[in-house]
């Protein structure tokens, strides 16, 4: 779907970004902030945002340049999994092992695979954790992708939706046993929608937040079709129905918090700590984890 423009240095189009410039956060509600802290902060080694939502009823957990928003309500489990890039999988394994005793009786588990670690949160959300590598560009800590499971036959229409309605690029459909739509949503970030024949439960209410350069075109599309969930307010709007851009057929449900680049939080720097820093083995000057700007 992307026109390849060759230059002396190779494929110039490979450096293009589309209208979606950043996947900023994934929001899933959790019923217990203490268990969430054991998993996201102690286990995964992420960083509780020191500036925003510091009450006991919500937590923003930073992962490089992205976040998890974890307000207190009944648990939301998204169909699929979340990809993470973490700097040290051996340290991750030690941390996950250390929290097992505190997460007994929940759905928490973890498994070391050949090239990644699978971690399941106390309520069933799946995380696949990798070390930095070429497939993730220059990301050394962050959320490179989120993969959602969708009904058979939906991938092509979803790809067309993101390309034509949201202006995303690059957009591709990888065919095979389980076709998957791959949507570029900023520097080293993707949304993936993989077809499955397995039964899919009802939409749980989770959402994602993205920043877009042109917000009016997609807003007009949804407004004309009565698909706006929350109108423009504070430089953002919300929708949740992904539809075929031609026929209007519903393809999947995923709430999007769509923010313009005029939003005051665009470009907000995220604090990330060094999770290997401990009181017993303290190393002066190594409290912070520094990510490339």
Name each model-derived stretch:
Residues 2-19, 25, 49-50, 90, ...:
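Vicinal oxygen chelate
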Residues 148-149, 155-159:
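Histidine-/acidic-rich catalytic cores in large beta-rich domains
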Residues 10-12, 16-72, 78-86, 98:
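An N-terminus-focused feature that recognizes amino-terminal "leader" regions
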Residues 205-209:
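Loop/turn-rich, solvent-exposed surfaces of beta-rich toroidal or solenoidal domains
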Residues 65, 77-79, 141-143, 203:
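Short, solvent-exposed loop/turn segments at the edges of secondary structure
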Residues 44, 166, 226:
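Glycine-centered, phosphate/nucleic-acid-interacting loop/turn motifs that mediate DNA/RNA or nucleotide
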Residues 36-41, 124, 158-165, 222:
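Conserved active-site tyrosine of GNAT-family acetyltransferases
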